[in-house]
Amino acid sequence: MTAASSHPLGLTFASFAGLGPEAGFTAAQWAVDAGYRSFWVAETTGLEAFSTLAAIGAARPELDLGTGVLATQLRTPGVTAMGAATLQALHPDRNILLGIGVSSPTVVRRWHGAEYGDRPLARMREELTLLRLCLSGEKVDFAGDFHTVKGFRLGVRLGERRPKIILAALNPLMLRLAGELADGVLLNYLPASHVAWSVEQVRAGGDATVYGYVHVGVTDPEPNRDLGRKDLFSYIVVDAYADNFIRAGFADEVAQVRECHAAGNREAALAAVSDRMVDAIDILGDAHHVHASVQAYVNAGVDVPIVMPMPWGPDRMGVISDTINAAAGRL
């Protein structure tokens, strides 16, 4: 067993959900065959997370099931608890990994017409507290700054195993909050070199398990770096991610991209995403390079690497399959 595969691996559907549900079922089976332990579904405007995981879970009973992540602004804590508890009741012998986080204004306001809200740290602290109360099965009376609940009691009977709450976090205060109140923290869009700093912030709050999305693809980097530029550009223009990229050592790229974007020059903005940045975050190469890259995240402090295959190339499912195997050390 290789060093990387000695850690429990997860697979996220986030980067290829556009290929449809059948691609998820197929990839989940490949993950089972390669020894993966969990399967994760993100949620923006495509597949709904809980129903997708219920179906995947029924077909692939070996896998724990994770939401990675749900926007807290789009569900009440009670509704979120109901969805997670339903998954847990359907799959009582598995871990349900309830990943939540603050989404972007584009997703919340523009795409869904919901209120984005202010005071994200205080709001998330309250969300985590109320969500855990709602999952307890006890009667909940709660009066906070953002939520008031009277008489909620989860109507799903659960055994001793209950959903674990995983908080997606980028900035120091949110990372510390994850360590303090969540069961785990989910890192994303960061190079391996920035993991240790992130883990240090988490540990200032507590002992939460560190999950990390690792963006890798067994494919030729040269013709596909422009896809990486487009991917990273779409996050650089989001303030929270821009700040994190700056902390990770990409201040020049962030400044140039945002300046060009503000001027309406998308072509120049994309060109400002350097090869160095793409190669550090959306990692492409042969199987050995992908395997070593996953190991770098483990060495830096990620407890559970969650492989996000970058399905770039003429045979997208082939890239996904090769990436799943390479990350697991099946070289």
Where are these regions (language model features)?
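Active-site-adjacent structural elements that line small-molecule/cofactor binding pockets in enzymes
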Residues: 1-331
